[in-house]
Amino acid sequence: MTKGILGRKVGMTQVFGENGELIPVTVVEAAQNVVLQKKTEEVDGYSSIQIGFEDKQAYKADRKSNKFATKPAEGHAKKAGTAPKRFIREFRNVDTEAYEVGQEVTVDTFQTGDIVDVTGVSKGKGFQGAIKRHGQSRGPMSHGSRYHRRPGSMGMASDASKVFKGKALPGRMGGNTVTMQNLEIVKVDAENNVILVKGNVPGPKKGLVKIQTSIKKGNK
């Protein structure tokens, strides 16, 4: 069954394995996870748990920022006996009997050696060309080429007379939801609410990440 938790990316460091191997790891701090809702097939058509992460400030009538909770959000969190949460995510294929509404989900849900998928929002790179954005090869840099870093052909001229969808063009790069699959948990530090994940995970420092059991290898 799937296990999951939400956290923030602290940064990267390195640890030594038992055989002396140097392992690059990403530090994820995962505290304040609370089960806000349990969904069942009878009522909702599918089974899942809804987890909230990081408290929001209480509702204010003259609020000018989304850091303050709305009245519906306050009512939803009140059913779980907790404060409104800033981030809310669902986890399917979960043993719902093992969770209760209002229960705190801690990092010791996972164990060292577990294989997980980590989802986050990639770093924004701003407006970039086709080479950096899509990995396109550049043209010859020699004198007289007249084709160096341009996107290339836009398509046929007379017949189609249009640029087809999917053409690799310059544009805004990054800021996409990215999932890194089959990453290994190197260490779980329950005292500090920290999980060490082998390798890198999407997003900048302090970015929100979602960790769940690998859909390809986690249930084997």
Curated annotation (Swiss-Prot):
Superkingdom field: Bacteria
InterPro entries: Ribosomal_uL3 (IPR000597), Ribosomal_uL3_bac/org-type (IPR019927), Ribosomal_uL3_CS (IPR019926), Transl_B-barrel_sf (IPR009000)
MF-aspect GO terms: rRNA binding; structural constituent of ribosome
Any one Gene Ontology cellular component term annotated for this protein: cytosolic large ribosomal subunit
Function: One of the primary rRNA binding proteins, it binds directly near the 3'-end of the 23S rRNA, where it nucleates assembly of the 50S subunit.
Quaternary structure, from the entry: Part of the 50S ribosomal subunit. Forms a cluster with proteins L14 and L19.
Family named by the database record: Belongs to the universal ribosomal protein uL3 family.
Entry protein name: Large ribosomal subunit protein uL3
Originating organism: Macrococcus caseolyticus (strain JCSC5402)
